Amino acid sequence: MKLLFKRYSSSHIGKLIKDSLITPEILPQLGRQPSSHKRLPNNKRTNSITDKWLKDALTRKDKLNEDKLQNVNLRLNVVLTTLQKLRTSDNPALYFALLNRIGTGHIKWLNKSGRQIDAFPPDRLPLEFYHELSNMLYKLSLRSANDKIALAKFSLQLLDRYYFLKTKSLTIEGKFRANIKFLRNCTLLIVKSQSNYYLRAIQRLFAENSEGQLLANLSQLAFYVETSQWTSMLDILSSCVPDSGLRGSKERERAIQLLELFSPCLVKSLKVMIAQNMENEACQILRSLSEWNFHFDQHDSSNLIQLSQNHSCLKVIETMNGLSSTTAVTRQFGLEKLPTDVSLKQSIHILSKDNFEPLKQDSFLQFLSFKLSDLPLNLEVWKKHIKEVDDQMQAESNLHSLRAFFIDMLLCHLSVRKDFDFMLSLVEHIVYEKNLWQPLLLTDNIVGNKENSTFHCLFHGASQDISTKLTLLALYNQLNEIGYQFTSHDFLSMLKVCKNYSDSDFFYFAFYNLLVTQSHKFFLFDKFSDKFSWRLPIQIGDAISEWLSSLEIDIQENTDRVLQITDDVGEWYVENKPFKSEKGTIQPINIMELRKIFGERKTLFHMDSEIFQKSKAKRDKEMRNEALFTANDAEYNFAADVSYAKRVENLFSYIRSKQMQQK
């Protein structure tokens, strides 16, 4: 099983590389260890896994020495393929162990046809290994680890050494061009450090080696995107898509490749422009990219089109349709011809007139929620606005489904833009005063909205406030009683509010219920390795990592416990492969088996308000015994949490009573 959250011990990325990758050819500043130094713990064993891989790469006449590689012929493509598989299977320890082994020997490298590769100084690794290593370092940088500065330093040293070997290579001077994917990887490693100092350093290396202004501009764009400097990003964007007629054929081809490699930054820039209603500017960038024969992949294209529909940027959709062989469906139930300043009430009027049915028709009308942004942070103003829109809907259609659509749009907007108290107050107004509890329940049936309906919005809104642990517990218990279909995002919201050791029992309660209901969705088939694997989603792994890193006591104990749980659950799925034969669906792990994995005496499998308060008091006492106090303790408001939780319980009690009255 591949873990997506880091282990808080001595296995940080920077230390892993320093311990394993002590190869002067790659990192000359670390120096070569004495010959008596045993680099690998298993290098005395002739049957170690690295020995096996190297034997696969040997020519028939060579033999592998158990301690060192001396004067052997290895096939480059076989070793590279092994490294690529280790990278893809997320095994950095063995990856660097193998790279270290080949870097400390005297090897003659052979190409696929068996001829020696001699276009680089003797006893130096071929440049292909630099390209491959940059891919691995970039993959490591995607983790939520505290090693991004270390990776940035490594990438600078790697690039500097790469250019040095380039000048010393036997390739004819002037014809050698650096691998642009390697340059992109090094750039993004630097960018992820968010250090302007390292950015300037890599740009100087590019300038000294005549890599061209476009690469420097794209690296600057990537830096602005990573650091969310949107104004600066917009200023430099046009220079990243220059006049396509100014280049020769080779330079043009290289520029197109660079643009494609940096396409995530370009896509993010376009998304910012669309969100800011910079429609004309976005269209100009799209037209400039088309002159370079640049094409977005289907995923990015779909996301840009949907975002444009959400923000009613119809010119962008038309431009993308003109540049693409496929055409997006842009009809918005009569809204496509409306000016952007049309009010929400006018939009609802058109939807009602066109008999829009959100429970049957899929739509891209989320952009209407942006028309709520102008309302001030005043509860009475919002209540008045809700009344006006609802009165209009009652007069024109009185359809519960259209009112459900309006409520869902309203709460999705509130969950990300207002505090939880404000959001909960409006929900209470909708249920108690407006008597719209039926449309509220219907939001779960809106087409294409299964994972973003009202109650999921409540989970997300509550997770934005640190004083909502008991509130989220109450919300979960109330919905669990009626058999509600939770998503992994609901449990992510519960994990996010865990901020310190006092939250331990609540954390394991949420983690357990996540695995009860969602773990079968994390069991996937890896096409590359041709095997099944089980892994936690990245966001879940990040939330777990954040909680583990915030613990004041028992850090190692909890880290080991979480790792053991995920290991055991993953092993259960991989070993049992619990498929239902009739449909090919995956059977969730047995609850009794999962409880055994968590530990019956260690975990609270049932938790209500009283149990929560007792468990928190117990953990608080353990903290006081250690004389520990954190900023998170001061931020958490228990009284507010109790109040929110009671209001949530009252809401559900009221809705249940209304349902009983109608039976």
Curated annotation (Swiss-Prot):
Gene Ontology cellular-component terms listed: cytoplasm; mitochondrial matrix; mitochondrion; ribonucleoprotein complex
GO biological process, one term: Group I intron splicing
Source organism (scientific name): Saccharomyces cerevisiae (strain ATCC 204508 / S288c) (Baker's yeast)
Pfam families: MNE1 (PF13762)
Highest taxon, organism lineage: Eukaryota
Annotated InterPro entries: MNE1
Listed name of the protein: Protein MNE1
Note from the entry: Present with 861 molecules/cell in log phase SD medium.
